[in-house]
């Protein structure tokens, strides 16, 4: 029973999130200490910006010129390094604590080409939670995405049904138009034929009349 309440407490508690930023120069190394329990998942996201004199503000640098080096060390085990990752100026990383204790997370801006002593701004956000909780969150996200995909598929089916209905209406309208045009054409031909017959008949009648009158 007690374990059930503990599980509920873990589920209901939000993830611990901490976000901050600091200023420095290219090549500076900044470290943070985190006390983590066993099977705790630490997720970090970072964004490195470099001061641009033309913009008079900080902006994302070229991936060819700058990068980030990420190290995670176990302080309780003589600073044994368990993570060494090199990334782009903007990205994320994750780490699963295999043992309970204090961990040191270090980020160092890396300058690939010599561009002088440039001022930098590093934004970092840590998210700490149990792996099962994060898996649950990912599952909920996938279910939400699946629901959105189902809605989109339903809308696509409705659109296709409307398109099919429009095609059927267009075909019906085209058949009616062709039928009307065909009838109009035959009615015109009939009228012309009748006019020709009437003209011929009138010509014969006039000719017969003039013959009787001895005009022709």
Swiss-Prot record:
GO biological process: endoplasmic reticulum to Golgi vesicle-mediated transport; Golgi organization; intracellular protein transport
Gene designation per UniProt: ERP6
General function of this protein: Involved in vesicular protein trafficking.
Keywords carried by this UniProt record: Endoplasmic reticulum, ER-Golgi transport, Membrane, Protein transport, Signal, Transmembrane, Transmembrane helix, Transport
Start and end residues of each GOLD domain: 29-130
Protein name: Protein ERP6
Entry superkingdom: Eukaryota
Lineage summary: Eukaryota, Fungi, Dikarya, Ascomycota, Saccharomycotina
UniProt topological domain (Cytoplasmic) ranges: 205-216
GO cellular component assignments: COPII-coated ER to Golgi transport vesicle; endoplasmic reticulum; endoplasmic reticulum membrane; endoplasmic reticulum-Golgi intermediate compartment; Golgi apparatus; membrane; mitochondrion
Transmembrane segments: 184-204
Record's signal peptide: 1-19
Family: Belongs to the EMP24/GP25L family.
Locations listed in the record: Endoplasmic reticulum membrane
Disulfide bridge positions per record: none
Residue intervals on the Lumenal side: 20-183
Membrane topology (UniProt): Single-pass type I membrane protein
Family matches, as PROSITE patterns: GOLD
InterPro entries the record matches: Emp24-like, GOLD_dom
